From Swiss-Prot:
Cysteine-cysteine disulfides: none
SUPFAM superfamilies the record matches: YbaB-like
Main location: cytoplasm
Classification via PANTHER family: NUCLEOID-ASSOCIATED PROTEIN YBAB
Gene Ontology cellular component list: bacterial nucleoid; cytosol
Subunit structure: Homodimer.
Species whose genome carries this gene: Vibrio parahaemolyticus serotype O3:K6 (strain RIMD 2210633)
UniProt protein name: Nucleoid-associated protein VP2178
Family (UniProt): Belongs to the YbaB/EbfC family.
Molecular function in Gene Ontology: DNA binding
HAMAP family: DNA_YbaB_EbfC (MF_00274)
């Protein structure tokens, strides 16, 4: 079924892929991504594991209404989270050779 050494090679390839994926998970968890809203007036920087590192608010917004500022912060965070997801997909595709995860299945972090 697997031919000469086929099963051994298959197991070795699976182990190598698992090691690459573990390294990738660590790399993604430590990366920082910045999302923006209000044409860059609000910036939120998060890690690959979605921990907020920084929130930068342009001084000009400090006198505007509170509700608008809250909306801009939420939008900037959502933009950063979307960017993390895109980066995860791109990096995962490079490890899996473009093989996609089943719908609804996410990386374990």
């Amino acid at each position: 079924m697997f031919g000469k050494g086929g099963m051994g090679n298959l197991m070795k390839q699976a182990q190598q892929m698992q090691e690459r994926m573990q390294k990738l998970q660590e790399e993604i968890a430590n990366m920082e991504v910045t999302g923006e809203s209000g044409a860059g007036l609000v910036k939120v920087t998060i890690t690959g594991s979605h921990s907020v590192r920084r929130v930068d608010i342009d001084e000009s917004l400090m006198e505007d209404d509170k509700e608008m500022l809250e909306d801009l912060i939420a939008a900037a965070f959502n933009d950063a989270a979307r960017r993390v997801e895109e980066t995860q997909k791109e990096k995962m595709a490079s490890v899996t050779g473009g093989m996609q995860l089943p719908p609804g299945m996410k990386m374990p972090f």
